[in-house]
């Protein structure tokens, strides 16, 4: 796996937010993205060809979270929009990022996150507390799933 530094531009997202324990994130993806896709079905002007699912994590040291993570379950969209129910406009941040492409089952994404975090520490890069995953096109072969892991740098 290759880890590198890139400059990211802001990418608008349609998202649903939830505080969830890390071990439960996988079971919450489908119900939350179903809400986003139902919204996008009613707002087709926001969609664009090749848009991907994104999970965005905002890490906050807040004792009230009780070990739960701030997770935004999202889909890339053309532009910001007015909030409708639980679906709101969000965005991946612009700036310098450390990034790597994970190839393989989603259950192993934690390994790639760990690799990027260790690489950042070993190379003098501080993470800013926001990271995200961009899910590539679906395939039935879990060994060929591609997910881009990004960490905003401080």
Tell me the role of every PLM-derived stretch:
Residues 1-154:
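A solvent-exposed interaction/effector surface
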């Amino acid at each position: 796996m290759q880890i590198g530094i890139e400059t990211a531009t802001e990418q608008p997202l349609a998202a649903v937010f939830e505080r969830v324990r890390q071990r439960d994130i996988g079971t919450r993806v489908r119900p939350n993205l179903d809400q986003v896709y139902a919204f996008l079905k009613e707002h087709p002007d926001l969609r664009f060809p090749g848009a991907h699912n994104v999970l965005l994590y905002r890490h906050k040291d807040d004792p009230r979270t009780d070990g739960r993570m701030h997770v935004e379950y999202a889909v890339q969209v053309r532009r910001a929009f007015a909030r409708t129910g639980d679906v709101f406009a969000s965005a991946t941040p612009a700036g310098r990022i450390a990034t790597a492409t994970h190839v393989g089952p989603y259950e192993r994404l934690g390994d790639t996150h760990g690799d990027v975090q260790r690489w950042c520490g070993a190379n003098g890069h501080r993470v800013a507390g926001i990271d995200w995953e961009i899910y590539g096109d679906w395939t039935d072969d879990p060994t060929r799933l591609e997910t881009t892991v990004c960490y905003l740098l401080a």
